[in-house]
Amino acid sequence: MKKQIYTLFFLIFFFSCNDTAETFLSLKKNKVNVRYGPSFDSDVKYVYKKINLPIKQIDKKENFRRIIDMKNNSGWIHLSQLKNNNSVISTDLKILYKKPSSFAKPIAQLKKGRLLIVKECKKKWCSVETGKFTGWVDKENLWGISK
């Protein structure tokens, strides 16, 4: 009996831990409709007009994903308009460095709200591209990536 109780607690703990992982996605197109509900019959709530914009998935129903953006706008988007996340948004003034170190040569200053395309990430740093600049930025104050 004790063994069954311990097994039950373990399974509950294991599955509850897996549900806490954040899922970020990016917009696949330049124009994406966000709907009130998970159906093409639902009215359009608003339209995103920014390809690669990162969004956070908070629910799913069939081929629709309920999302929330950096400004807490939420709604439903069809899966065909989404892709695996490849971008982040700077939530504060940031410095883009040549190498993944705050002692490296600064390349550019990134303003709050800047969309960055992620090339790769290491522990505390991500290699990003924005406009004509490519470099490294620390993960702190970036929205759209699991820490």
Language-model segment annotations:
Residues Q4-F14:
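Sec-dependent N-terminal signal peptides
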Residues T20-N33, P38-K50, P54-E62, I68-A108, ...:
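Boundary regions of SH3-family modules and the immediately adjacent low-complexity/disordered segments
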